[in-house]
Amino acid sequence: MADDNWNGTSSSNGTLFTNVRVLDATGEYPYTGEVLVQGNRIKQITKGSSRFGSSSSPYGGATVIDGMGATLMPGLIDAHLHLSWNNAPGIDPIQMMEVEEHMLVTMEMAKLVLDAGFTAGRGAAAAKPRLDVVCKKFINQGRFPGPRYLAAGPEITTVGGLGDSSPSHIPHEGLNLGIVVSGPEEIRRTVRQLIKYGVDSIKLNLSGESITGMGAEETPMSEEEVAMAASEARCRNKVLSAHARSSGSVKQCIRHGIQNIYHASFADEEALDMLEAAKDRHFVAPGIAWLINTARHAEQWGIKPGSPLSMEYERELEMCVETMKKMHRRGIRICIGGDYGFAWTPQGTNAKDIQTFVEMLGFSPMEAILASTKFGGQIMNMGDELGMIKEGYLADLLLVDGDPISDVRILQDKNRILAIMKDGKFHKAPRINEQRRRLTA
């Protein structure tokens, strides 16, 4: 039976997965084998038919899980998480939620993401200064369930930029989704303040966003401001991320060493050449679910297909698809992460990105899975211990009913995810009897 204890369960002597198809996310085709987990690490991998058949008796003191032919794969990783985005129909209900309620909702969103099989993720921005930081702390302490997480602070933006939400007659910083700055010295102070709060990364809004009124192809932050942010972040060994839809903003990311480039829809050939030359130092996460759903699936919330705003996002979606195909051909690392957290992009549906990468961006199923596992470990700056099934790696694992290589859509079906293990402990333990009926039906 499954254990519903959200704090996770594990055998003190480890867990042995037998009779599984191992999708190790190295690029190798899945193979039959068994995987031994001890503590929070993968201790041993054995290729070939299981030596234990359907036995559920302990082996070396470990609990044996007979996979009955299910797929064992790394946990999914979202490169662009907003855990404090509360599935609201717009920015105001996110920003105006009082902090006490907002903290609880953030923890609720973290559980939704983990329930969907995402065992890790990089925070892309928080709605309030310490929501991500406290969320990560509580998850790491085992007090609440959630993915392995890197915390962000609010986005840093310019006057009039994305995140500057206050009206002219009420110029109050509390009304802004981002932290509004003007000039390098204000950037310096803001970066230092966020690092004091405990963030893992600094996020800059280097381009506009159609839904806010500033065009996505605009690049409002000066070179001096970006350079200051990069300098201050490097002083404290913090990673930089950027909202960068415009070509100019993508080039700023490359010039100033901003590792994580979010969106990049309008990158021109010069930007692509620059990015290809520096592809070992950067990641791109297009946030394509936001474009698709805002353009086509948000009518219930006032964005009608065919409206000017919808058509603007359709135009960007077309550009994004072509740009990502070009990047993919150039070998640039593209990660999943669809900007989930609005009513029309709800948390917990994150695995839809994998299907979209296959159907729209020209990825093979294996490539799309690598974008959500192997490259995810790398964008977490944990590529030597996360995102693949290898001996010594962290035991963040999914047991999946079926073959995701044959049909990536099964990763969106929570009923097909038979088990979720994070850090060597089951968040969702397999229901052995039900599993056998399902897999032998």
Where are the regions a protein language model picked out?
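Histidine-rich, glycine-flanked metal-binding segment
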Residues: 2-16, 22, 26-73, 93, ...
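His/Asp/Glu-enriched, well-ordered alpha-helical/loop segment
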Residues: 235, 304-308, 316-403
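Active-site gating loops and adjacent loop-to-helix segments of metal-dependent hydrolytic enzymes
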Residues: 83-102, 114, 159-176, 209-222, ...
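Divalent metal-dependent hydrolysis catalytic cores, especially in the metallo-beta-lactamase
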Residues: 106-132, 145-155, 199-210, 238-239, ...
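Histidine/acidic-residue-rich catalytic or RNA/ligand-binding cores of hydrolases
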Residues: 88-90, 132-133, 161, 212-214, ...
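C-terminal cap of metal-dependent C-N hydrolases
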Residues: 20, 372-374, 391-438
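Alpha-helix-loop-beta-strand connector modules within alpha/beta enzyme cores
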Residues: 137-155, 217-242, 283-286
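Metal-associated gating/positioning segment near the N- to mid-region
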Residues: 67-141, 159, 224, 256
